[in-house]
């Protein structure tokens, strides 16, 4: 896809620069071998490479504005596939961005990668939160929730610091498990009612009590209610934002998450 092409091109830019710098060019493909020489990389080339990587792997992760494929894919795929897409594939793409994020900080400093991910993360949260209001399809609503939570991960990286990085990693894990449960439950609901339209789904407790109980757990987890894991990661996000980030951005994120939860 075009997104992967951008990510590959960004990776190749770093590889080509590394091959010219490190003593053994054959080791340029290994990030662990390249890291000690990060400060010798061309800053302009690294900024361009990081931009390509965010665009490329951000497309796979569903970050705004490369997120448009995600609701369609989730709504049309079988529920177990949607669970894998949201719980595993999106997080793998974000983990790739995390790897290059740390390397870019060592090469050009923290301001450029952090500011880029702050903006992309905040916009992903707000756009996804507002888009969820218009969705009647259960799986499309969950898909936009995935966009929002991937935005939270990007925002954590943008805030940076030990708390921000810890929040990003924890949110990857907790959201992966929670959203996997949510999509599996949506498949059970669709099987029981023959529809994904929220306007036509009523009385889940009477029709499928076990599914209803699991749905409540999934929704409480996605809403970041304590003691669920996403409460911990989002609490750390706000703590990191108050400690290291601009307060106006923390307010914007709080509003976006409030809209999404409601």
Give short role names for the model-derived ranges.
Residues 1-262:
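Hydrophobic transmembrane alpha-helices and their helix-loop junctions in integral membrane proteins
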């Amino acid at each position: 896809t075009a997104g992967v092409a951008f990510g590959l091109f960004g990776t190749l830019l770093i590889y080509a620069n590394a091959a010219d710098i490190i003593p053994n060019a054959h080791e340029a493909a290994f990030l662990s071998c390249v890291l000690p020489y990060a400060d010798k990389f061309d800053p302009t080339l690294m900024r361009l490479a990081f931009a390509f990587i965010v665009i490329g792997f951000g497309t796979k992760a569903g970050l705004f504005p490369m997120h448009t494929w995600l609701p369609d894919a989730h709504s049309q795929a079988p529920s177990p596939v949607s669970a894998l897409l949201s719980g595993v594939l999106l997080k793998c793409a974000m983990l790739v961005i995390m790897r290059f994020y740390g390397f870019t900080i060592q090469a050009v400093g923290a301001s450029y990668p952090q500011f880029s991910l702050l903006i992309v993360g905040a916009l992903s949260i707000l756009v996804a939160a507002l888009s969820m209001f218009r969705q009647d399809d259960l799986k499309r609503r969950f898909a936009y929730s995935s966009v929002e939570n991937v935005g939270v991960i990007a925002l954590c990286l943008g805030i940076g610091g030990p708390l921000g990085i810890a929040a990003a990693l924890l949110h990857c894990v907790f959201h992966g498990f929670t959203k996997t449960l949510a999509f599996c439950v949506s498949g059970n609901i669709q099987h029981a009612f023959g529809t994904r339209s929220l306007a036509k789904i009523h009385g889940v407790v009477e029709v499928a009590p076990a599914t209803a109980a699991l749905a409540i757990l999934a929704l409480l987890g996605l809403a970041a209610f304590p003691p669920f894991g996403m409460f911990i990661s989002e609490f750390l996000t706000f703590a990191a934002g108050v400690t290291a980030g601009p307060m106006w951005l923390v307010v914007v994120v709080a509003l976006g998450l409030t809209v999404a939860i409601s």
